[in-house]
Amino acid sequence: MSDDAMKLVVVGAAGRMGQALIRLIHATEGLTLHAAVARPGSAFIGKDAGEIAGLGQIGIPVTDDPLSAFLHADGVIDFTTPATSVTFADLAAQARIVHVIGTTGCSAEDETRFKAAARHARIVKSGNMGLGINLLSVLVEQAARALPPADWDIEVLEMHHKHKVDAPSGTALLLGEAAAKGRGIDLGDHSVRVRDGYTGPRPAGSIGFATLRGGAVIGDHSVIFAGEGERLTLSHSAGDRSLFARGALQAALWARDKKPGLYSMLDVLGLSTR
């Protein structure tokens, strides 16, 4: 480990994403695991983070004290729950460190809290940390801008594993936001999340969402542009959860020397149009 290696905290360290992050940090030059945090009461508290991740002992015990874990760290990687991520954002702001948030299912109130924390922390937040999905979102925005809403309907279809607890997925919403941006509309005013029973005709100009859950699917997303006599489908399939971990670590390194603010993966990847 070099003296200038970025010292990262992994929260939710005992989960599948947490373990993937620990393994990848261990294998990535320029990064070092500073601390690993699990929820209070977890059976993994006190155990070696490396052993949990299948690396063997690395001398980092899992803790349930994020405040001490953030002390002297350079950044935190966070794929947890909305309420927990809000708490971590406040702590990251106090510590003036990087906070990469891959948590999905956040409310408007949560987003307001993240914006407040970003006055002092460098926050990178995205519904998906992968390069492919973020490139897809740019293509979706361009297609939505080019195809007249009177002639083309937009539907977002997603499937995830049976353990996922929020719907639509953060990635589906990211793609919906891209489509809405391309059309110059507000997604909240034009999205259709549920169809059941006698729904009547499809509302003109709406953006529909369909959610599937089952098996061990890591993440499949399609945006369908349905016109008269033709259909355009833009899609992405994730086959390995480590792609999200790689993106999160790329975001942390990118944000290290940035000024406080709320950024997205489009900023990290140089795809932002703002």
Swiss-Prot record:
The active site is at residues 160, 164. Its EC number is 1.17.1.8. InterPro entries: DapB_C, DapB_N, DapB_N_CS, DHDPR_bac, NAD(P)-bd_dom_sf. It catalyses: (S)-2,3,4,5-tetrahydrodipicolinate + NAD(+) + H2O = (2S,4S)-4-hydroxy-2,3,4,5-tetrahydrodipicolinate + NADH + H(+); (S)-2,3,4,5-tetrahydrodipicolinate + NADP(+) + H2O = (2S,4S)-4-hydroxy-2,3,4,5-tetrahydrodipicolinate + NADPH + H(+). GO terms for cellular component: cytosol. (S)-2,3,4,5-tetrahydrodipicolinate binds at residues 161, 170-171. NADP(+) binds at residue 39. This is 4-hydroxy-tetrahydrodipicolinate reductase. It comes from Rhizobium rhizogenes (strain K84 / ATCC BAA-868). The lineage of its organism: Bacteria, Pseudomonadati, Pseudomonadota, Alphaproteobacteria, Hyphomicrobiales. The gene is dapB.
